[in-house]
Amino acid sequence: MEYFSVGKIVNTQGLQGEMRVLSVSDFTEERFQKGARLALFDDKDRFVQEVEIASHRKHKQFDIIKFKGMYHINAIEQFKGYSLKIAKENQGKLAEGEFYYHQIIGLEVYEKDQLVGEIKEILQPGANDVWVVKRQSKRDLLLPYIPSVVLCVDIEKHRVDVEIMEGLDDED
């Protein structure tokens, strides 16, 4: 079975079995809603068990969650540093023009049919995602995911067409 990361447990929160999670999902309300089923993976990325979300709330930059049946700090303290993942078949469908990160990472980036590089990471610094493009013999290129820069994403062809606006590439 294939799984995709939705967050990492960074600490416990209080004594009642709550955990602080750093989310890596754009769908936190859906992923962490009561009754949602996720897989727990240890710090060596080994499957541990499936868990069900009992509660979810936001606190500062964290998602605070509690697992069903684990209502005390002693039951969950061992999970610090573990990852929460969703099974591929539970991801759900996206609207036209929306993509999961795992679909974007690894795509080749072209500007006017000239290969620029390959997307190696996606950052979330603010209003827009930023795609990190690994280039040969140059520093990584940071591309904001905005319509004037990212012109076309073709998952089937493993290709992204972009227009690198002046000022985005400091090596030109």
Swiss-Prot record:
GO terms for cellular component: cytoplasm; ribosome. Keywords: Chaperone, Cytoplasm, Ribosome biogenesis, rRNA processing. It comes from the Bacteria. Its main location: cytoplasm. GO terms for biological process: ribosomal small subunit biogenesis; rRNA processing. The keyword Hydrolase does not apply. One of its GO terms (molecular function) is ribosome binding. HAMAP family: Ribosome_mat_RimM. PANTHER family: RIBOSOME MATURATION FACTOR RIMM. The PRC barrel domain binds ribosomal protein uS19. This is Ribosome maturation factor RimM. It comes from Streptococcus equi subsp. equi (strain 4047). The gene is rimM.
